[in-house]
A protein has these predicted regions:
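Macromolecular interaction modules
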Residues: 1-222
Length: 222
């Protein structure tokens, strides 16, 4: 991690959720991945400097060899992103404490082909972000984060030799206090109404057939 400039590393492990599966299929979303990884760096510049060192090259080879043992490279993608916390009603003690029961939806977002990246990101962050904030209570949403891609030759150079595929146009993460809270929220008529409003807005700027989502628990490695 340190040799590559990594400052934080979190694994999101998929857990079964008939409720979220129904939510996804109702939107005609694609099949989701088995897990996702989030890695933090201080900046693109710091990451680029770290990756230029001999130690980083050696560490990268070790990681690549290990990845081949349990992942399918052609199904993996990566991008450098900037987080936008739209709202956060989860106390840190609740999210990371010993009694942490939080779960989150990890959603790869793809834009409609006629939109450029700037128009898509503005529509997603401002228009849709405000709508999600308004409908958070009936949906049981406690925290909502959008991650927007930023240009990174370093990440492209890291992903290319590994044969990774094209990354999505963004990532959505939505937290619930617990799996039980998600189930309770999704069973309420108010959630169905709010979900329909969100879906009507989503199709104006996302490509549903490429979007994927799964329910996960966070595992903070460091």
């Amino acid at each position: 991690g340190p040799a590559l400039g990594f400052t934080r590393y979190v694994q999101n492990h998929r857990i079964p959720s008939p409720e979220l599966d129904a939510f996804s299929s109702g939107r005609n979303w694609a099949d989701a991945s088995d897990a996702s990884v989030e890695i933090w760096v201080e900046s693109e510049e710091a990451f680029s400097v770290a990756c230029a060192s001999p130690e980083a090259a050696e560490a990268g080879l070790i990681l690549e060899q290990d990845e081949k043992r349990f992942t399918s490279a052609k199904k993996i993608s990566a991008f450098l992103g900037q987080e936008h916390v739209i709202f956060d009603h989860l106390a840190a003690s609740h999210r990371f404490g010993p009694e942490d029961k939080t779960v989150k939806m990890v959603c790869q977002v793809w834009k409609r082909p006629e939109l450029n990246a700037a128009a898509f990101q503005e529509r997603w962050r401002i228009g849709h972000g405000n709508l999600v904030r308004q409908l958070a209570e009936p949906m049981g949403f406690k925290r909502y984060v959008q991650t927007h891609p930023v240009s990174s030759p370093t990440v492209a150079a890291f992903a290319g030799p590994r044969g990774w595929r094209q990354p999505p146009d963004g990532l959505t993460e939505i937290w619930w206090e617990s799996e039980q809270a998600l189930i309770h929220s999704f069973s309420a008529p108010e959630a169905a109404e709010a979900g329909a409003v969100l879906q009507k807005d989503e199709v104006q700027f996302v490509d549903p057939k490429k979007v994927t989502a799964f329910l996960a628990r966070e595992h903070v490695v460091f």
